Amino acid sequence: MKPLILKLSVLFMLGISSSMSSATENGADSYALGAEGMMAGALPPPGIYLLTYYQNYHAGRFDNGPPNFHLDVNALIPRLVWMTEKNYLGGQLGFYAIQPMVDLRLSAAGMSDHNSALGDLMLGSMLGWHQGNHHWIGAVETVLATGKYDTPTATQPVVANIGKNYNTIRPILAYSYAPPNGIDISTKLSYSFNDENDDTHYTSGDYFAGDYSIGYKLTDKFKVAVEGYVFKQVKSDELHGEDIKMRGQVLAVGPAVQYQDKNWSIEAKYLTETQVENRPEGHTGLLKFIWAF
């Protein structure tokens, strides 16, 4: 069977799932593409912080995927961060937990499904370093298969699954350069290792993903930026141990603005996807709100 036909067959046998963004198995993954932007590499002082993300994602086509494809995702993602006073290897220690809440509408090839549920729980630990205008973060994130997941059936082959039904380990590096002249150059890079979906015997291939931001501070409180994300699958998916030799990729870019006050900030962006291969293609709007307790 040719790779494209095999991939399409797998999509209809297993159902198509998604949460915040999409990649790998059935065009879906747990990485929040585009969520981070300005000062992504700078951790705050010790304390407790609430970060709340809202994302609307719409895709009207699936490259090398099923016909008549439409995907609409609305996600509210609270992230609780605890920065401790402890230091290891010269870096400040912190922890975080993320629990997505997702509403997903999906249609493909004349079939449709809708789901609203909790997504997969994410837990992470991190170290942050600061040296003059340079800021770094090193982190390890675990994505647990806790979200709602329904195994597709012959009568319901297209399923709007919120959870992925597999676990992920994700090392992360982030960096920001913020000199006094107002420039803000930031990036967050990650690599994801996925285990097998026990219900489908499908293993999503390893992939590289990253957010980027090139911004400028217009005033003490207001910044503008060009932001986006990249995704590149570097290992093929597997079904029952056999490679499916199609790998996803995407590049997204768009404008962003940020307003920051004493103990809170809000960032908004609109990103359009291009250079898409073997995955949904669309656009996304994101809001990120940070509150320091």
Predicted segments, located by residue:
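Cleavable N-terminal export/targeting peptides
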Residues: 1-31
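N-terminal, post-signal peptide beta-strand-biased segments of exported outer-membrane/organellar beta-barrel
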Residues: 22-82
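Short loop/turn motifs that connect adjacent beta-strands in outer-membrane beta-barrel proteins
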Residues: 24-26, 39-47, 84-94, 108, ...
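Outer membrane beta-barrel transmembrane domains
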Residues: 27, 34, 55-57, 201-293
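Residues on the lipid-exposed face of transmembrane beta-strands in outer-membrane beta-barrel proteins
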Residues: 40, 52, 78-82, 123-129, ...
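Transmembrane beta-barrel strands of outer-membrane/channel proteins
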Residues: 50-56, 95-101, 138-144, 187-191, ...
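Outer-membrane pore/translocation modules
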Residues: 101-197, 202-203, 260
